[in-house]
């Protein structure tokens, strides 16, 4: 579909990509069972690098969440390991910046790195020769006194994310999707997307197409199949967004469906549901236009 397809940025043989899993059709399947999706934990918020040689995902345990990664080394995928982790605080919802020199995520770590966990902020780590550097808070332009969640980037560097900063006091669960454009590498004051996308309830976990032609996000608005459903909205000619459309029972369940991501080659749509990561052929997105 437009905005989804691009030339794969890799010379890796196709059989080695996607952890050497058998590709899905238009019915979602659990991704890499026994390797990524395990029975004794929850997995969510996944992203592949542009060249398809690194897979980053979240793992939730009993008391905190961590960011894991596996890489294709030669013709073998490495054992997944935690790359952003803390014994007390959670790190999750990872996303890569357009040039992949930074990994953004959220954390409930206080600014001074001490004391009780706090409402989540946006953080990032810079890529180093050996992996990822120490977490750094993304600062007061992106972060507010309210929780922030889930980052996604356009090719031009606009950052989409979730925040309850616009909610009235006593209505802190009214999360909305915001966008912050980068000017000369500096993020500008975030703007809330309009009511075609946002509702009076929870709207978040947004994935934006690299060319900003569509959004996929999770919402708890009335009329869905479960506690949170995935919706899609397309860019209009005047720069607005079409009325968000529920992605239906093929994608959504009676549980929580969230954390969407479409691979850079435009082939696969990933999302999280019922404590596992799922994938499906991205051509399914054409059916919602």
What are these regions (language model features)?
Residues 8-289:
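Short, conserved micro-motifs composed of acidic
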Residues 2-3:
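C-terminal motif of bacterial Sec signal peptides marking the signal peptidase cleavage site
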């Amino acid at each position: 579909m437009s905005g989804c397809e691009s030339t794969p940025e890799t010379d890796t043989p196709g059989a080695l990509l996607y952890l050497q899993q058998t590709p899905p059709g238009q019915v979602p399947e659990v991704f890499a069972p026994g390797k990524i999706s395990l029975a004794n934990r929850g997995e969510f918020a996944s992203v592949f690098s542009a060249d398809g040689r690194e897979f980053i995902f979240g793992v939730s345990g009993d008391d905190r969440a961590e960011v894991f990664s596996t890489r294709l080394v030669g013709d073998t995928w490495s054992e997944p390991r935690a790359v952003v982790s803390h014994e007390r605080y959670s790190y999750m919802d990872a996303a890569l910046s357009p040039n992949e020199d930074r990994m953004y995520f959220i954390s409930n770590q206080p600014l001074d790195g001490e004391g009780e966990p706090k409402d989540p902020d946006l953080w990032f780590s810079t890529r180093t020769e050996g992996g990822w550097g120490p977490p750094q808070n993304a600062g007061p332009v992106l972060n507010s006194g309210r929780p922030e969640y889930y980052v996604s980037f356009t090719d031009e560097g606009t950052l989409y994310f979730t925040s309850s900063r616009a909610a009235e006091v006593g209505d802190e669960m009214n999360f909305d999707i915001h966008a912050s454009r980068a000017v000369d590498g500096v993020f500008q004051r975030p703007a809330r997307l309009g009511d075609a996308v946002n509702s009076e309830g929870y709207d978040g976990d947004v994935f934006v197409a690299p060319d900003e032609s569509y959004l996929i996000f999770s919402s708890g608005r009335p009329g869905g199949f479960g506690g949170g459903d995935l919706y899609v909205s397309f860019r209009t000619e005047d720069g607005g967004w079409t009325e968000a459309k529920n992605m239906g029972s093929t994608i959504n369940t009676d549980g929580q469906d969230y954390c969407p991501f479409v691979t850079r080659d435009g082939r696969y749509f990933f999302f999280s549901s019922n404590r596992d990561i799922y994938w499906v052929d991205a051509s399914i997105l054409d059916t919602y236009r």
